[in-house]
């Protein structure tokens, strides 16, 4: 069996030098690096990642936990964009990804921490995990470097990244109000997620700021699916036909809301105005084009990777939560009641 000692003998260097080259560690000259790599390729030597991990106490892998309430898996457009940019940055630093399934038979008996340690990952990336998950305290206490998206996970080796969900939601409601809307409903989520709760807060703050009356039946809770938006909008319009606008905490909700409005024989953007949240790529196929709050998904993925690398590679790094600004994208689903009055 070919070993690094065989490489070292042929290259005329020590085994430790070969190890440094193969693991990308400093302290080796450029010519020696090129020579070792050339001989490695000639002999067809492939380092054993498990053995290397035992020697360095690093597996160069990152575990990804994703809890999917809607069973859409990695097909969800918001998730796709974040994961793509996260993978690019983490991969460029020599790390591979391990995806932990959320329907594994051991899920009910093994914690996130236990599964992460079993796979010997260097860090964790969490998405879609609700604040109420009983495993989160153990993850924070474990000191396994961890970064999360839209989950306020804080600890010595844990940090999180989120969009300005409160500000983004408030900007959507402010835009409705600037167009003369006063009877504005909100569809948020019932999963106790940070984005859902924060977007509801933004809606409430904007309504209160402008002294608008608010009926409890104007707030509907749903999941983040188009079906959830459809059912919620049906209830909203049945309970109060005088509503003129609906803010949806997610674009998929908004697409369902648009369908419900059309079912009522009403026109989206004329009879009832809609604003979503996310700016998913699917919107380019929707008519009328949806006004929405855009999240910088690629930037979130890149920042998550960079923060996790710091947490994994610098034991003294102490991170602060990162909030990324949003942008209201104005399209065709909000009518101007001021002009029509």
Where are these regions (language model features)?
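Alpha-helical recognition/docking segments in bacterial nutrient-uptake
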Residues: 2, 57, 61-174, 178, ...
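Residues at alpha-helix caps and immediate loop-helix transition turns in enzyme cores, especially N-
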Residues: 32, 75-78, 135-138, 196-199, ...
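N-terminal helix-turn-helix DNA-binding module of bacterial transcription factors
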Residues: 1-60, 340
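Bacterial carbohydrate/catabolite-sensing allosteric modules
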Residues: 10, 42, 85-94, 141-148, ...
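Short gly/ser/thr-rich secondary-structure transition/capping motifs
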Residues: 42-48, 105-109, 129, 258
């Amino acid at each position: 069996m070919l070993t690094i000692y065989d490489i070292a003998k042929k290259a005329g260097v020590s085994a430790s030098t070969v190890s440094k080259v193969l693991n990308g560690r400093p302290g080796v000259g450029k010519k020696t690096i090129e020579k070792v790599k050339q001989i490695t390729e000639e002999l067809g030597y492939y380092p054993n990642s498990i053995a290397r991990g035992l020697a360095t106490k690093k597996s160069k892998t990152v575990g990804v936990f994703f809890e999917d309430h809607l069973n859409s898996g990695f097909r969800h457009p918001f998730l796709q964009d974040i994961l793509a940019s996260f993978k690019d940055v983490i991969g460029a630093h020599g790390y591979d990804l391990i995806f932990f399934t959320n329907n594994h038979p051991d899920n009910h008996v093994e914690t996130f921490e236990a599964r992460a340690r079993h796979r010997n990952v260097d860090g964790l990336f969490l998405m879609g995990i609700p604040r109420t998950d009983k495993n989160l305290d153990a993850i924070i206490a474990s000191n396994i470097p961890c970064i999360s998206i839209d989950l306020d996970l804080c600890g010595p080796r844990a940090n999180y990244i989120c969009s300005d969900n409160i500000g983004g939601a408030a900007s959507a409601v402010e835009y409705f109000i600037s167009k003369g809307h006063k009877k504005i409903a909100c569809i948020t989520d019932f999963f106790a997620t940070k984005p859902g709760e924060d977007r509801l807060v933004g809606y409430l703050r904007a309504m209160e700021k402008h002294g608008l009356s608010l009926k409890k039946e104007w707030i509907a809770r749903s999941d983040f699916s188009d079906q959830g938006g459809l059912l919620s909008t049906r209830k909203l319009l049945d309970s109060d036909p005088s509503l003129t606008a609906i803010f949806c905490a997610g674009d998929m909700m908004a697409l369902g809301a648009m369908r419900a409005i059309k079912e009522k024989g009403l026109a989206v953007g004329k009879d009832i105005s809609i604003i979503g949240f996310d700016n998913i790529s699917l919107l380019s196929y929707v008519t009328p084009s949806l006004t929405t709050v855009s999240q910088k998904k690629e930037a979130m993925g890149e920042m998550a990777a960079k923060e996790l690398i710091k947490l994994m590679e610098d034991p003294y790094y102490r991170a602060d939560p990162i909030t990324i600004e949003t942008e209201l994208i104005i399209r065709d689903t909000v009518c101007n009641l001021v002009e029509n009055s």
